[in-house]
Swiss-Prot record:
InterPro entries: C69_dipept_A-like, Peptidase_C69. The keyword Protease applies. It is an enzyme of class 3 (hydrolase). One of its GO terms (biological process) is proteolysis. This is Probable dipeptidase A. GO terms for molecular function: cysteine-type exopeptidase activity; dipeptidase activity.
Length: 465
């Protein structure tokens, strides 16, 4: 999918947590309704068959419960995308990435292999650490191959790992430095790799021989291998579609660093100038180049400059999940899955405890027809109504975001205090209360946006009886 990823190491985050976040964006001209569910062991397939390819395989008989954000309609497969399992291990899959003809000539893509549709279902229920996730997915890639190029994130309380596929059967992975964040648009990202450091770097068993055989290392010294040069792309399209997204995230999180939005040398990871919050993650994943000539809603720039770069906060985002694994918390509340549906400049992030058996209907009952009884379609309506007069509605959108996220933090604090006091807490009930609150606030926002948008219609006339 045409997504955007940000990863935040535990020493770079405000609360010592690991954070994995990604927007899932549909292809241009397409919109994919999403829902959030809990997949229990009895609902996990024991023999898996893909819809997009002829791939199939037997799965272990001991899956864990996990959250999932599948396609609501299911006609094209599962596409589980993001989740947390009962061991508080997360997976976000996938970020579609680029490759090059040298790689594809040496290791062609495999039409019968796995893809984004399959990966979370095949891996997340069976792993107890982020590193295990890398190794399980890597083994499947080596055995069955893949028909597309993808980046995948795994995290637990201690670590975040990022895996990128190389051709049909190869892969490479790097552990995110604890004091750094990673920005990854739809482009091969890893720019440094150490074959002699398996604590922080992993890859398919024959990768070094593969590189040597097909002359893929483009560095002069061969002392500091750059996977992005070897396996990635430097296309004109990347300068408009991909690199500007990494640039704008890094500009917000490292304003002291001067960089070119079209540069192919943007670092995969950076140490931020201050610690990163959930709100920061929401902000960068909502970016449309605010206060710049590239902003499609802005007063600066020209009609050409406003369309030159692809915004992160695009119209066709299906869902966004922030997988937030917090340290020094009781295991049942350590993992939080913050969820949003629809276009990011118009929505909010809602926190849910993941060690539950069900998800509130407002987030789980997305259907094909447009409706206001679920979060997905209500957010889609708000975005479509507010877009033509974004600046008029911006204050209402900002207030909604701040108030709902404040309520989310308050809920998390209250539940933790209750548990520390020895009280019993029903986490499904707490999720439901949060959902009910957000449903009310979102309906109020829709009412306001519709009223204002109606008064701004082209056929309005100021004189009345």
């Amino acid at each position: 999918m045409a997504c955007t990823t940000i990863l935040v190491g535990k020493k770079a985050s405000y609360d010592g947590s690991t954070m994995v976040a990604r927007t899932e964006d549909s292809q241009n001209g397409d919109f994919t309704p999403k829902k959030m569910i809990v997949v229990k062991p009895e609902d996990q397939p024991r023999h898996y068959r893909s819809v997009q390819s002829s791939f199939e395989m037997d799965l272990p008989d001991n899956p864990m419960t996990y959250t999932s954000v599948p396609d609501a309609l299911g006609k094209d497969g599962i596409w589980a995308e993001a989740g947390v399992n009962e061991a508080n291990v997360t997976m976000s899959a996938t970020e579609t990435i680029t490759t090059n003809s040298r790689v594809l000539g040496a290791d062609p893509l495999v039409a019968s292999g796995i893809g984004e549709e399959d990966m979370v279902t095949l891996v997340l229920p069976y792993i107890r650490s982020a590193r295990e996730g890398v190794l399980r997915l890597g083994a499947i890639l080596e055995d069955y191959g893949t028909y597309e190029s993808n980046g995948v994130a795994f995290s637990d309380e201690h670590d975040i790992w990022w895996l990128e596929t190389i051709g049909g059967h190869h892969w490479i992975a790097r552990r995110v430095p604890d004091d750094a964040y990673v920005t990854n648009p739809n482009q091969f990202g890893i720019d440094h790799f150490e074959f002699n450091n398996p604590e922080d770097y992993l890859c398919s068993a024959d990768l070094k021989d593969f590189i040597d055989t097909y002359h893929l290392d483009l560095t002069y010294s061969h002392e500091h291998f750059n996977p992005r040069y070897a396996f990635g792309s430097q296309r004109d399209k990347d300068r408009h579609y991909n690199t500007p997204r990494a640039w704008i995230m890094q500009k917000f999180l490292n304003p002291e660093i001067v960089q070119d939005p079209r540069s192919f040398a943007l670092a995969w990871c950076q140490k931020p100038y201050r610690k990163i919050t959930v709100e920061d993650v929401k902000y960068v994943l909502s970016s449309h180049y605010q206060d710049m000539g590239y902003d499609p809603y802005g007063s600066e720039g020209t009609p050409v400059s406003k369309k030159v770069f692809r915004p992160i906060g695009i119209n066709r985002t299906s869902q966004t999940a922030i997988l937030h694994i917090r340290p020094n918390k009781p295991q049942e509340i350590a993992a939080i899955q913050w969820m949003a549906y629809g276009s990011m400049p118009f929505n909010t992030m809602v926190p849910f405890f993941t060690q539950v058996k069900t998800i509130p209907d407002y987030f789980a009952n997305t259907y094909e027809n447009v409706s206001t009884d679920n979060f997905y379609w209500t957010n889609r309506l708000i975005a479509a109504l507010a877009d033509p007069h974004y600046n008029h509605h911006e204050t209402d959108l900002d207030n909604y975001l701040e108030e709902t996220m404040a309520k989310g933090h308050a809920m998390l604090h209250a539940v933790e205090a209750q548990l520390l006091a020895g009280e019993t807490v029903d986490l499904e009930e707490e999720n439901q209360k949060m959902s009910d609150y957000v449903q009310g606030e979102t309906q109020t926002l829709l009412n306001k946006i519709l009223f204002d948008a109606s008064n701004l219609m082209t056929n309005r006339f100021s004189l009345s009886d």
